[in-house]
A protein has these predicted regions:
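Repeated scaffold domains used in trafficking and secretory/extracellular systems
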Residues: 52-57, 100-105, 124-137, 174-184, ...
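Short, conserved, GDST-rich strand-edge loop motifs in beta-rich repeat architectures
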Residues: 55-66, 131-133, 143, 193-215, ...
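Beta-propeller domains
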Residues: 73-117, 148-173, 226-230
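C-terminal motif of bacterial Sec signal peptides marking the signal peptidase cleavage site
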Residues: 15-18
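N-terminal edge beta-strand
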Residues: 562-592
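Surface loop/turn motifs at the tips and blade-to-blade linkers of beta-strand repeat domains
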Residues: 92-95, 128, 170-174, 236-244, ...
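Short loop/turn segments immediately following beta-strands, especially the blade-tip
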Residues: 83-87, 161-167, 221-231, 295-321, ...
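Extracellular/periplasmic metallocenter environments
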Residues: 559, 621-662
C-alpha cells in the first residue's frame, strides 16, 4: 500500500509539473489519488514546487550525476556536494585541522599542515579558502586533482581525488595573501596563484609613504608534477607587478591558450588612513573610471624562466617587472572599475569582466587584443606596462543590472552573471560563434532571475571548461536572512540550485541549501563519472601520503608487536573489527613513542578510528590504510585508546590501555 501511495504521489507531481503557472495544488476531485492531493494541499505546494521536487529528487540508493566542490571560506575546508540533490557528501580538511577525518591530530596529516607553515616555522592552522579549481586536460576537467588557495596566508593546497584528501600545502615565500587562485592552465601545467593586496616582496617592512616605489603585486605560476601529484617550487616562477590590487584570474584556452587574464583594482594606488583624515579604502580605491585587466603571455614567461632571466628571491625564481615588459609578457587594457571576475568563454575567444560599480559586463576579444599587441605603438601606465586602448580590445558591452561579478557558461550559447546588488542571476546571449546556439540576438540580456540574497560567486555544470554541460547553475548567495529557521545571529549561507535547461526566460530556482559550517566563495561542478576514487585503498598497508605501501605496514595481526630500544618504544598495531592488537601498551614517562597502525579491513566503509585520551591524538583509518604517529610520553598515568568510528555491534569493546609509568 505504501509503495502504491508513493507511486501515485510521483505520478501526481509529474501531471502537475506539466502544467504552467504558479497555481495551488488542485483539489482531490481532479482524479489524483487522494493521498497525493492531500499531501500537496496540506503543505500548500504549487505546480512549480512539484516541478522543482522532480528535478532535484534522487531516489534512495541512487547517486547524483554531478559533484560540486565548494570552498569553505574562513572555515579553511572544501565541501563536496551532490547536484541536483544538494546533499553534502564530504567535508575535506585542507588548511584547518578537521577531527572527523583525523586531519591534524597525528599521522601524516600533521606533516601536510606543517608544509604550509610560515618560513620561520610559525604554525598556521586556519585558512580562508576561496577558489577551488579542478585539474584539466585539454581544457576539460579530468577528475584527478583539486587545488584551492588560502587568501589569508597566500597558500596553495593540492587534493588528490583518488581519496579526497589533502596531500600538499605550499606557503608562498613572497606574498602574504592572495585572492586570484587557484586557477589552472588548460593541461594543468601550472596552478596560478594571483595576489591581492600589494606589499613589499617577501612582506618586508616599508612605510606606506613609499607605497608606489616599494610595494608590488606578484603572480605565481606553480609548476604541477602530475606524476608525483605535487607542486614543484623549483620549477615554478613569479612575475613582479605594479602595486595595483590584482584580483580574479582565468586561463585562456582554445584560440587564447598560452595567455592568462587577471582583474585588478586600486589603480589609484590608495593607501587608506581614514583615522588620519584620508579617504577610506572603499572610496580611495574607486575614484578612477576604470582599472586594468592584466594580460599575461605565460608561454613567453615560461621561456624567460627556462632561459634563466630571473632573480632568485626566498627560494623561488622571480621575473622582474622590467623584464616582463621588455620580453612582451605583460600588458594592460582598461576594465570597468572595481572588477571581480575575468572569465574566458569556452572556446577562448572572449574574456568577460564584470565591474561591481558598473551595470554592464564588458566583453573583450582575444583576437583584437592580440592584434593590438602585434601592432605595437602602445602607450604605457606609470610603471611602463603597455596599455591597449579599450576601443582596441573591447568586443561588446551588455547592460545587466547592479553589481555584476562572475560569469559562467552553458551549452546553449548563454552566459550567466551574478548580480550582487540586484540579488539576481542574469542570463544573456553570447555573440560570435555562440550566436547560432540560441534564438536571441547576440549580446542581449535574456532574463534576470531573483535569488535570495546578495549572490556572490556563481557556478554551472562544467561551466568554465571548453565544453560546458548546461542544465544547472548554482547561485552562491552571501545572505540567507529569512530562508531558513533562525539559528541565532550568525546565519548560514544559501546555495540556490537554478534550472537552466530551457532557452529564453525560463530559468527557475529549484532548491535552497543552507551552508551552516562555511562561507563559500567559488565552486566548480564536475560530472560524477569523471571521478574515480578508491572504494578501499588498493593494498593493505597503504600510505595515503605516498600513495604506496608503507614500509611499516603489517598484513596480519600476528605481526603486531612492541619493541623497545633504549627510551624509544615502537609499536606495530593491527586494527580490525572489533579489536586492536596489542590492547596493552606500556611505556615509561619520557619515552619517545613511534606507533604504526594498519587497518587490515578490505570491506568498503570499514573505517576505524583511534583516539588516545590526554594526548590530543585522533586518527581515522580507512580500509587498508597505514598511519604512523610519533610523540613523547610526557604525562604519566593510565590512558585509554578506543575506536571513534562505530564499526560493529561490539564497537564499544574496541579499546585498549596506554600505561605510562612515572
Amino acid at each position: 500500500m505504501k509503495k502504491n501511495v508513493l507511486t501515485y504521489t510521483v505520478v501526481a507531481l509529474i501531471i502537475l509539473a506539466a502544467c504552467q503557472g504558479n497555481q495551488p495544488a488542485p483539489p482531490a476531485n481532479t482524479g489524483l489519488p487522494a493521498d497525493a492531493a492531500a499531501i500537496m494541499a496540506e503543505r500548500g505546494l504549487t505546480q512549480d514546487d512539484a516541478y522543482a521536487a522532480l528535478k532535484t529528487y534522487i531516489p534512495s540508493g541512487k547517486t547524483d550525476p554531478y559533484i560540486m566542490f565548494a570552498s569553505g571560506g574562513q572555515g579553511g575546508q572544501v565541501l563536496a556536494i551532490g547536484v541536483p540533490s544538494m546533499r553534502i557528501l564530504k567535508l575535506i580538511g585542507v588548511f584547518t585541522p578537521e577531527p572527523w577525518q583525523g586531519y591534524g591530530y597525528g599521522g601524516s596529516s600533521d606533516e601536510t599542515l606543517q608544509g604550509g607553515d610560515m618560513p620561520d616555522g610559525s604554525p598556521l592552522r586556519w585558512g580562508d579558502t576561496h577558489h577551488p579549481n579542478l585539474s584539466e586536460t585539454n581544457g576539460e576537467y579530468d577528475g584527478q586533482f583539486l587545488f584551492i588557495n588560502d587568501k589569508a596566508n597566500a597558500r596553495l593546497a593540492v587534493i588528490d581525488l583518488r581519496d579526497f584528501e589533502t596531500k600538499q600545502l605550499v606557503k608562498n615565500p613572497n606574498s602574504i595573501n592572495d585572492h586570484g587562485g587557484a586557477f589552472v592552465t588548460p593541461n594543468t601545467e601550472y596552478v596560478i596563484e594571483g595576489p591581492q593586496y600589494a606589499a613589499p616582496l617577501g612582506w618586508e617592512y616599508a612605510a606606506l609613504e613609499e607605497y608606489q616605489d616599494k610595494y608590488r603585486g606578484l603572480i605565481t605560476f606553480w609548476k604541477f608534477d602530475r606524476t608525483k601529484g605535487r607542486v614543484d617550487p623549483a620549477q615554478s616562477f613569479q612575475i613582479e607587478l605594479p602595486p595595483y590590487w590584482q584580483d580574479l584570474c582565468d586561463a585562456g584556452k582554445g584560440v587564447s591558450e598560452g595567455w592568462f587574464f587577471c582583474n585588478s583594482f586600486n589603480t589609484e594606488l590608495a593607501t587608506g588612513g581614514v583615522e588620519l583624515g584620508n579617504p577610506p579604502f572603499e572610496a580611495g580605491t574607486t575614484k578612477n573610471d576604470t582599472d586594468y585587466l592584466h594580460i599575461f603571455n605565460w608561454k613567453k614567461a615560461e621561456e624567460v624562466f627556462k632561459a634563466g632571466n630571473v632573480e632568485q628571491m626566498n627560494g623561488i625564481a622571480v621575473i622582474r617587472m622590467e623584464t616582463a615588459i621588455k620580453e612582451g609578457i605583460l600588458f594592460f587594457t582598461p576594465e570597468p572599475k572595481s572588477p571581480h571576475g575575468a572569465d574566458v568563454t569556452p572556446g577562448g575567444e572572449f574574456i568577460v569582466v564584470g565591474g561591481k560599480l558598473d551595470p554592464h559586463v564588458t566583453i573583450y576579444s582575444f583576437e583584437k587584443i592580440k592584434a593590438a599587441i602585434d601592432g605595437g605603438g602602445l602607450e604605457t601606465d606609470g610603471y611602463g606596462v603597455p596599455v591597449i586602448p579599450l576601443d582596441k580590445s573591447m568586443e561588446a558591452q551588455v547592460e545587466l543590472g547592479l553589481g555584476p561579478l562572475h560569469t559562467v557558461y552553458d551549452d546553449k550559447g548563454y552566459a550567466y552573471t551574478s548580480l550582487f546588488l540586484d540579488s539576481a542571476v542574469a542570463r544573456w546571449s553570447l555573440g560570435g560563434a555562440y550566436a547560432k546556439l540560441h534564438p536571441e540576438d547576440p549580446w542581449k540580456l535574456v532574463q534576470k532571475l531573483p535569488v535570495q540574497y546578495n549572490i556572490g560567486h556563481i557556478t554551472a555544470a562544467e561551466g568554465d571548461t571548453a565544453s560546458p554541460d548546461g542544465g544547472y547553475v548554482v547561485a552562491l548567495n552571501k545572505w540567507s536572512i529569512d530562508r531558513f529557521a533562525n539559528v541565532g545571529p550568525l546565519l548560514p549561507q544559501n546555495f540556490q540550485l537554478v534550472d537552466i535547461s530551457k532557452t529564453g526566460d525560463q530559468m527557475k530556482v529549484l532548491y535552497d541549501m543552507p551552508i551552516g559550517m562555511a562561507e563559500p566563495h567559488y565552486a566548480q561542478i564536475i560530472k560524477a563519472d569523471k571521478l574515480k576514487p578508491f572504494e578501499v585503498y588498493p593494498e593493505v598497508g597503504w600510505n595515503p601520503e605516498t600513495m604506496s605501501v608503507d614500509p611499516n605496514a603489517i598484513t596480519d595481526a600476528s605481526q603486531a608487536k612492541v619493541v623497545r630500544d633504549g627510551n624509544k618504544v615502537e609499536v606495530w598495531m593491527a586494527v580490525v573489527r572489533s579489536h586492536y592488537t596489542p590492547e596493552r601498551v606500556e611505556v615509561n614517562k619520557g619515552d619517545h613513542v613511534i606507533w604504526h597502525f594498519t587497518n587490515l579491513e578490505r570491506t568498503r566503509d570499514a573505517t576505524h578510528g583511534f583516539a588516545l585520551a590526554g594526548y590530543n591524538i585522533n586518527l581515522s583509518l580507512e580500509p587498508g590504510e597505514t598511519q604512523t604517529i610519533e610523540f613523547d610520553a610526557n604525562k604519566s598515568g593510565t590512558f585509554t585508546y578506543y575506536c571513534t568510528e562505530f564499526c560493529s555491534a561490539l564497537h564499544l569493546e574496541m579499546i585498549g590501555y596506554f600505561l605510562v609509568k612515572p
